[in-house]
Amino acid sequence: LLAFVALIALVNGLIGFVGSWFGIANLSLQSILGYIFAPVAAIIGVPWGEAVTAGSLIGQKIVLNEFVAFSSLSEIMSTLSPKTIAIVTFSLCGFANISSIAILIGGIGGMAPSRKHDIARLGWKAIIAGTLANLLSATIAGFLLTI
């Protein structure tokens, strides 16, 4: 996890360096993910004013892992509304991220080495299904908070 966080810092440094060439201050992987996943956050019930922040957390959970996303959430929790905190917390509670494919291949692939290709192919579908399940739970939680 420590090496992974260091790799994220390296990628953020490179993205920030390239962003400075084009006059974009504070460009990072998290900010890019925020804009990509902002519509998803808005669809699941996050107020639009906080959608980029929530989208960044959801993107971090999918692309990086849930530990990094929860760490980021704890740093900015005081700036978010209670509804957004609840929705984001539910959307981050899951193991559906890209690094999970490697864990699946390593764990299950050891029991069936000839099926590693199939496991890798199904891993992407498992990430999508797991993410949709988390987002559905987050949507229901957000809906129940408005009642």
Tell what function each PLM region has.
Residues L1-M77:
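Transmembrane helical segments that form the transport core of multi-pass membrane transport proteins
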